[in-house]
């Protein structure tokens, strides 16, 4: 049997929030599977450059692009620049959360504007790039978009109402966009990460990590690479008949 080409051979992928954590792991994995990767970052240019350098050192192709994906003009420039440098975008991974610091406060003590800002930031971080890239994908008649969400949307925990509501909003947006863009050949799916060992969970203590791990049948918390694998699966041609799908990468904490 002849060797099959890499899953993403000849494709360009844009990964938002790719300087650290799940985004960085996803960028590296997609590149390993043949994609040319646009590594988006907001603040940490050095970390994004290191991700791109790692990819190039392994024989792949990657370029970092700075942009705040909650800003429409910045997103427009990001997509224009990435397309000019790398070619039309075939895969869009919407990993940037837009929520820099979750409030981690009970709802009754959480200011209303904090909740509303979290929801708006997350919605903009998903819908602005999806609009900018989705238009070109629809015109081309093909494309794959994966939204990275959180298990908190369906299994909310005390103190995280801002994250739970924001993630539920983007999951609803993903389903709605899957309906609208499907006739144009564009697939949109959701990966919901369980507790993952990233900068976003640095606030947690050892007892928190043990408690989270104890809830999973697999007995451990996720690594960024665990979630990246689920993203790559849904983004790839292997999932060519999947759209509007919800894939939890949580070790079995939630079994929908």
Short names for language-model regions:
Residues 130, 166, 174:
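Active-site helix of classical SDR
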Residues 33-50:
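Conserved glycine-rich Rossmann-like NAD(P)H-binding loop of the short-chain dehydrogenase/reductase
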Residues 12, 19-20:
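Conserved glycine-rich cofactor-binding loop
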Residues 162, 183, 190-216, 226:
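A glycine/serine/threonine-rich, flexible loop-to-helix segment
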Residues 76, 98-116, 159-162, 202-204:
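Conserved mid-core segment of classical short-chain dehydrogenase/reductases
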Residues 108-127, 142, 146, 170, ...:
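Catalytic Tyr-X3-Lys loop
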Residues 135, 179-183, 240:
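Alpha-helical segment proximal to the catalytic Tyr-Lys
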Residues 182, 187, 242-244, 250:
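Short, small/polar-rich loop/turn modules that mediate ligand/substrate recognition or access, typified
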